[in-house]
Amino acid sequence: MAKNNLTRVTEFILMGFMDHPKLEIPLFLVFLSFYLVTLLGNVGMIMLIQVDVKLYTPMYFFLSHLSLLDACYTSVITPQILATLATGKTVISYGHCAAQFFLFTICAGTECFLLAVMAYDRYAAIRNPLLYTVAMNPRLCWSLVVGAYVCGVSGAILRTTCTFTLSFCKDNQINFFFCDLPPLLKLACSDTANIEIVIIFFGNFVILANASVILISYLLIIKTILKVKSSGGRAKTFSTCASHITAVALFFGALIFMYLQSGSGKSLEEDKVVSVFYTVVIPMLNPLIYSLRNKDVKDAFRKVARRLQVSLSM
């Protein structure tokens, strides 16, 4: 019996939707709709930025990478959810689970760093608009983006290595809809204390460090805006940050609830809802957030729409 208990698992069973079998078809349609809208919105945003010369600025350069991350983010998770809901197959191999966790962690970590970079970019634009493109030159922009990806990949390697060096024995049922850190730690049969300290400390550091950069950037932005004499000028200047503030509030709010809040006051169902929100809903909302109140993006979209209309009418 002891020997059986120590057998290493080769696959996991995702139990996230097992409690609601009657909702499988409606959930499939909802997740499929969200996924298609997310891909259309984010890929469309990337293409729009590439084809319109007016959007060749640091702000939209960073936004194109945010859209790329969001498209990848949801593509790591949602196809697995759709396959589970469509086929009823809840089994995921050990290697697939590790790969999903690794890719998901890369996207989440990189997005944290990128949102901090975008906050600094907004400060640079507001502090000295005339020298904005000089200060945020292409070399610096690429360095910041590459730095965000390197930090995201490095963090993912650390978290994945720590998590999957744990022993997973007889119990292989993950009460979640994808391979995320909290349910995997609960499932491990080896001592997780030391590894949890490393993972949680690093994760908290990444979230809090980037949140601090964003907070400092916006404090400096507010300080700069207060120097503007007209109230209309202050409102117009601050409105350029509204989309980014909304995206930051949604993303970091979900991460803080999920990973920084004490687990004693949370239920697993709450974790599932929040996970759906930041892995599926937020990537779908970001293109809308950045385009609805953005005149440049709306003008570029109208221009492309007119070109398509002309080409189709010929």
UniProtKB/Swiss-Prot annotation:
<dbReference type="GO" id="GO:0007608">
    <property type="term" value="P:sensory perception of smell"/>
</dbReference>
<feature type="transmembrane region" description="Helical; Name=1">
    <location>
        <begin position="26"/>
        <end position="46"/>
    </location>
</feature>
<feature type="transmembrane region" description="Helical; Name=7">
    <location>
        <begin position="272"/>
        <end position="292"/>
    </location>
</feature>
<protein>
    <recommendedName>
        <fullName>Olfactory receptor 9I1</fullName>
    </recommendedName>
</protein>
<keyword id="KW-0552">Olfaction</keyword>
<feature type="transmembrane region" description="Helical; Name=3">
    <location>
        <begin position="100"/>
        <end position="120"/>
    </location>
</feature>
<feature type="topological domain" description="Cytoplasmic">
    <location>
        <begin position="293"/>
        <end position="314"/>
    </location>
</feature>
<dbReference type="GO" id="GO:0007186">
    <property type="term" value="P:G protein-coupled receptor signaling pathway"/>
</dbReference>
<dbReference type="GO" id="GO:0004930">
    <property type="term" value="F:G protein-coupled receptor activity"/>
</dbReference>
<feature type="glycosylation site" description="N-linked (GlcNAc...) asparagine">
    <location>
        <position position="5"/>
    </location>
</feature>
<feature type="topological domain" description="Extracellular">
    <location>
        <begin position="1"/>
        <end position="25"/>
    </location>
</feature>
<keyword id="KW-0325">Glycoprotein</keyword>
<keyword id="KW-0675">Receptor</keyword>
<dbReference type="InterPro" id="IPR000276">
    <property type="entry name" value="GPCR_Rhodpsn"/>
</dbReference>
<dbReference type="InterPro" id="IPR000725">
    <property type="entry name" value="Olfact_rcpt"/>
</dbReference>
<comment type="similarity">
    <text>Belongs to the G-protein coupled receptor 1 family.</text>
</comment>
<keyword id="KW-0812">Transmembrane</keyword>
<feature type="topological domain" description="Extracellular">
    <location>
        <begin position="161"/>
        <end position="197"/>
    </location>
</feature>
<keyword id="KW-0472">Membrane</keyword>
<keyword id="KW-0807">Transducer</keyword>
<feature type="topological domain" description="Cytoplasmic">
    <location>
        <begin position="47"/>
        <end position="54"/>
    </location>
</feature>
<keyword id="KW-0297">G-protein coupled receptor</keyword>
<feature type="transmembrane region" description="Helical; Name=6">
    <location>
        <begin position="238"/>
        <end position="258"/>
    </location>
</feature>
<feature type="topological domain" description="Cytoplasmic">
    <location>
        <begin position="121"/>
        <end position="139"/>
    </location>
</feature>
<feature type="transmembrane region" description="Helical; Name=5">
    <location>
        <begin position="198"/>
        <end position="217"/>
    </location>
</feature>
<keyword id="KW-1133">Transmembrane helix</keyword>
<feature type="topological domain" description="Cytoplasmic">
    <location>
        <begin position="218"/>
        <end position="237"/>
    </location>
</feature>
<comment type="function">
    <text>Odorant receptor.</text>
</comment>
<dbReference type="GO" id="GO:0005549">
    <property type="term" value="F:odorant binding"/>
</dbReference>
<feature type="disulfide bond">
    <location>
        <begin position="97"/>
        <end position="189"/>
    </location>
</feature>
<dbReference type="Pfam" id="PF13853">
    <property type="entry name" value="7tm_4"/>
</dbReference>
<keyword id="KW-1015">Disulfide bond</keyword>
<dbReference type="GO" id="GO:0005886">
    <property type="term" value="C:plasma membrane"/>
</dbReference>
<feature type="transmembrane region" description="Helical; Name=4">
    <location>
        <begin position="140"/>
        <end position="160"/>
    </location>
</feature>
<keyword id="KW-1003">Cell membrane</keyword>
<feature type="topological domain" description="Extracellular">
    <location>
        <begin position="259"/>
        <end position="271"/>
    </location>
</feature>
<dbReference type="GO" id="GO:0004984">
    <property type="term" value="F:olfactory receptor activity"/>
</dbReference>
<feature type="transmembrane region" description="Helical; Name=2">
    <location>
        <begin position="55"/>
        <end position="75"/>
    </location>
</feature>
<feature type="topological domain" description="Extracellular">
    <location>
        <begin position="76"/>
        <end position="99"/>
    </location>
</feature>
<dbReference type="InterPro" id="IPR017452">
    <property type="entry name" value="GPCR_Rhodpsn_7TM"/>
</dbReference>
<keyword id="KW-0716">Sensory transduction</keyword>
